[in-house]
Amino acid sequence: MEQEETYLELYLDQCAAQDGLAPPRSPLFSPVVPYDMYILNASNPDTAFNSNPEVKETSGDFSSVDLSFLPDEVTQENKDQPVISKHETEENSESQSPQSRLPSPSEQDVGLGLNSSSLSNSHSQLHPGDTDSVQPSPEKPNSDSLSLASITPMTPMTPISECCGIVPQLQNIVSTVNLACKLDLKKIALHAKNAEYNPKRFAAVIMRIREPRTTALIFSSGKMVCTGAKSEEQSRLAARKYARVVQKLGFPARFLDFKIQNMVGSCDVRFPIRLEGLVLTHQQFSSYEPELFPGLIYRMVKPRIVLLIFVSGKVVLTGAKERSEIYEAFENIYPILKGFKKA
């Protein structure tokens, strides 16, 4: 009987030493159990059938506790683990915004023990969009970033004319210039080369040169119209050559107010077009009379360009003052023509 009491006293001393081993810490940083309590042992008849175990508060004095029977690894882990958990929890609380931060149990006065992993899991369930609390792994891409990239609309970096590989080509440029002097058209027609003048038919001298291959209409008022050039530079060069011919004939001609009045371009979209459907859909801008003219006339508002559209896919653009207006008009009309492509 005395031997059993001795064993019981040794067991109680060990339990008391184990209860006094762990330092007091907050329930928030406890990794396993919320409170230190007596461990139920079936060999102890006093505690095996006790349904309400008694909670014991630990003290902070460890001077009287003998820790020699425990290994150093367990003691070191128990000492280091609350520090690591506290450091991780402070980083998570700082990274979270003030509105999304979960209150600690000490603020709510609730005696629940939560470790750092359960806190992060509960926060990720409540706030799935918060990327600060859960860091994505480097092997697995972030699904949120992929979804945002897929939602963002992509705009083409190149104009439509370059995307489809079709660029309108300039076919004719009409320009005007003022020679600023009165002219004798009969004298010009008699002495100039490649010039003709028929006042009953047309009240201007028609003069032609080979390089650049153009035609000029010279009026007695000193105004001149130059047609047939393929570029702006060629049109200006041809007008200067005509003015030089007039100067050599003894007229005080000058070169004033040169201006491009009209540019004509053409292209081929390389597919047949349903003109009947196009004129029904865009009747405000187009007119189509196949008995009078085989092409559809489309009057674009901005830029102010007139387009002649044919069934074969050929398109003529006219009425532009600048080259960019030709390109812009074709970029606007090409998606419309593609919608009326013949099957």
Curated annotation (Swiss-Prot):
GO terms for cellular component: cytoplasm; female germ cell nucleus; nucleus. The keyword Cytoplasm applies. It is found in: Cytoplasm; Nucleus. One of its GO terms (molecular function) is DNA binding. Signal peptide: none annotated. Keywords: Cytoplasm, Developmental protein, DNA-binding, Nucleus, Transcription, Transcription regulation. Residues 71-152 are annotated as: Disordered. Its main location: cytoplasm. Transmembrane segments: none annotated. InterPro entries: TBP, TBP_CS, TBP_dom_sf, TBP_eukaryotic. Residues 94-127 have a biased composition (Low complexity). GO terms for biological process: DNA-templated transcription initiation. Interacts with TAF3. Belongs to the TBP family. This is TATA box-binding protein-like 2. It comes from Homo sapiens.
